[in-house]
Amino acid sequence: MTNIGGPVVENASIEHPVISEEEGAAAFARVMAQLKAQVGIEAYTSWFGRLKLAEYSRNLVKLSVPTAFLRSWINNHYGSLLTNLWKQENSAILRVEVIVRGMKRVSKGVVCRTSAAPVVLEGQTASSFVESYTEPSVKDIEAGVFGSPLDSRYTFESFVEGSSNRVALAAARSIAEGHKSALRFNPLFIHASVGLGKTHLLQAVAAAALKRLMPARVIYLTAEYFMWRFATAIRDNAALSFKEQLRDIDLLIIDDMQFLQGKSIQNEFCHLLNMLLDSAKQVVVAADRPPAELESLDLRVRSRLQGGVALEIEVPDYEMRLKMLRQRLKVVQQDDNMVVISDEVLQYIAKTVLGSGRDIEGAFNQLLFRQSFESDLSLERIDELLGHLTRSGESKRIRIEEIQRAVARHYNVSKQDLLSNRRTRTVVKPRQVAMYLAKMLTPRSLPEIGRRFGGRDHTTVLHAVRKIEDLVCDDQTLAKELELLKRLIGEQAA
């Protein structure tokens, strides 16, 4: 028997007669009580709150969680503990396995997704089991995605629509539904700060495309996973096969494009991108900034990405934040109808937590956790608990790109004007104001700011900063403009 922080496996060929549902539920409750006592309520709520019993036999226990990340974390950090607790409950147990809900095991398929197993092509026999993304409504589709795992929660149905993401959502739906008009904005490039729904939207496209395309040739990858797979293929002398698999697809979805590094890898990606686009195959890409600002990317890649349509997802407004909270509560109440949070409290959170969807989710989870042992939470207590996420909390880090966008909007010029060599007064003043604010509001050095403004020298930035400092002493209109811009930028970064 071997156990290194993960599930125990002993003699997988042994029969596993299934125990009754009532016995299983009782055993699961006892083991979970023991687990909570050993790890503490906070760790239990964080890591095991969504754990469910999927199967219980004489020798085997299968537990399910909603995400691959949660499965990996539990296996790596609590695998031995879980196995020992189940053995204490039933000494005949040989294996405790954690699986992801909504996935099934297959031995062959068209293209299957896996984080470690090899790609399986139609007609081949898998050398080991791999996981294929499925949902009950599409469980008979023998298709899938190889690459980064899909989270079954990330669908169009669960995506909260609002004014800040409506255009990006419409474009994503058009691609997922296979509209011919979608090729007019190919590639589709979605950019936003962290926690605003880029990954959710991209995975929703992949999930919907898998339902529609039979067989599906869909690949969803993070940029980091693409780099790892490519490096592994080179190491194993399988680079040619890897490239062929990537080229024989209908839809390529790349997340976190800002992390694509390395000259040779970027060169390969450029060839892949050119080939797919020239073949009228759809490409969807997401990053934390527009293509022109991905300075680490090869110029050819940036140019090709700019040839499609770039859409920004912005910070959610009050109505959208409230909608997200109401939907989150509805989902929780489906599992536990005893959970009650008043709409007044949800409205209060939506008004005070001004950040990303991830901040909203964090605020809701914090409230849900606290409510389990503080039944009557006042608004003052909620303020105290969520202080790190509200207006009174620490301000978020401001990016130069956010300053450039705000200044460009205010002075009715384009961002490209700010980066250009144009010397007209209508452009010079906004450019100097933006450089000044970049120096005041960010920790960036003068050379770095200069690079972000079209590759200018640091002395140009220094001149702009001093110029604005001199003007603001005598120009009350400019002083008010600067205060307004600081407030707008602060709200945008909140």
UniProtKB/Swiss-Prot annotation:
<dbReference type="GO" id="GO:0006275">
    <property type="term" value="P:regulation of DNA replication"/>
</dbReference>
<dbReference type="InterPro" id="IPR020591">
    <property type="entry name" value="Chromosome_initiator_DnaA-like"/>
</dbReference>
<feature type="region of interest" description="Domain I, interacts with DnaA modulators">
    <location>
        <begin position="1"/>
        <end position="103"/>
    </location>
</feature>
<dbReference type="InterPro" id="IPR003593">
    <property type="entry name" value="AAA+_ATPase"/>
</dbReference>
<feature type="region of interest" description="Domain III, AAA+ region">
    <location>
        <begin position="149"/>
        <end position="371"/>
    </location>
</feature>
<dbReference type="InterPro" id="IPR024633">
    <property type="entry name" value="DnaA_N_dom"/>
</dbReference>
<feature type="binding site">
    <location>
        <position position="197"/>
    </location>
    <ligand>
        <name>ATP</name>
    </ligand>
</feature>
<dbReference type="InterPro" id="IPR013317">
    <property type="entry name" value="DnaA_dom"/>
</dbReference>
<dbReference type="InterPro" id="IPR038454">
    <property type="entry name" value="DnaA_N_sf"/>
</dbReference>
<dbReference type="GO" id="GO:0008289">
    <property type="term" value="F:lipid binding"/>
</dbReference>
<dbReference type="GO" id="GO:0005737">
    <property type="term" value="C:cytoplasm"/>
</dbReference>
<keyword id="KW-0067">ATP-binding</keyword>
<feature type="binding site">
    <location>
        <position position="198"/>
    </location>
    <ligand>
        <name>ATP</name>
    </ligand>
</feature>
<dbReference type="InterPro" id="IPR018312">
    <property type="entry name" value="Chromosome_initiator_DnaA_CS"/>
</dbReference>
<keyword id="KW-0446">Lipid-binding</keyword>
<comment type="similarity">
    <text>Belongs to the DnaA family.</text>
</comment>
<dbReference type="Pfam" id="PF08299">
    <property type="entry name" value="Bac_DnaA_C"/>
</dbReference>
<keyword id="KW-0547">Nucleotide-binding</keyword>
<dbReference type="InterPro" id="IPR001957">
    <property type="entry name" value="Chromosome_initiator_DnaA"/>
</dbReference>
<dbReference type="InterPro" id="IPR010921">
    <property type="entry name" value="Trp_repressor/repl_initiator"/>
</dbReference>
<dbReference type="InterPro" id="IPR013159">
    <property type="entry name" value="DnaA_C"/>
</dbReference>
<keyword id="KW-0238">DNA-binding</keyword>
<dbReference type="InterPro" id="IPR027417">
    <property type="entry name" value="P-loop_NTPase"/>
</dbReference>
<dbReference type="GO" id="GO:0003688">
    <property type="term" value="F:DNA replication origin binding"/>
</dbReference>
<keyword id="KW-0963">Cytoplasm</keyword>
<comment type="function">
    <text>Plays an essential role in the initiation and regulation of chromosomal replication. ATP-DnaA binds to the origin of replication (oriC) to initiate formation of the DNA replication initiation complex once per cell cycle. Binds the DnaA box (a 9 base pair repeat at the origin) and separates the double-stranded (ds)DNA. Forms a right-handed helical filament on oriC DNA; dsDNA binds to the exterior of the filament while single-stranded (ss)DNA is stabiized in the filament's interior.</text>
</comment>
<feature type="binding site">
    <location>
        <position position="199"/>
    </location>
    <ligand>
        <name>ATP</name>
    </ligand>
</feature>
<feature type="region of interest" description="Domain IV, binds dsDNA">
    <location>
        <begin position="372"/>
        <end position="494"/>
    </location>
</feature>
<dbReference type="GO" id="GO:0005886">
    <property type="term" value="C:plasma membrane"/>
</dbReference>
<dbReference type="Pfam" id="PF11638">
    <property type="entry name" value="DnaA_N"/>
</dbReference>
<dbReference type="GO" id="GO:0006270">
    <property type="term" value="P:DNA replication initiation"/>
</dbReference>
<feature type="binding site">
    <location>
        <position position="195"/>
    </location>
    <ligand>
        <name>ATP</name>
    </ligand>
</feature>
<keyword id="KW-0235">DNA replication</keyword>
<comment type="subunit">
    <text>Oligomerizes as a right-handed, spiral filament on DNA at oriC.</text>
</comment>
<dbReference type="GO" id="GO:0005524">
    <property type="term" value="F:ATP binding"/>
</dbReference>
<protein>
    <recommendedName>
        <fullName>Chromosomal replication initiator protein DnaA</fullName>
    </recommendedName>
</protein>
<dbReference type="GO" id="GO:0016887">
    <property type="term" value="F:ATP hydrolysis activity"/>
</dbReference>
<dbReference type="Pfam" id="PF00308">
    <property type="entry name" value="Bac_DnaA"/>
</dbReference>
<feature type="region of interest" description="Domain II">
    <location>
        <begin position="103"/>
        <end position="148"/>
    </location>
</feature>
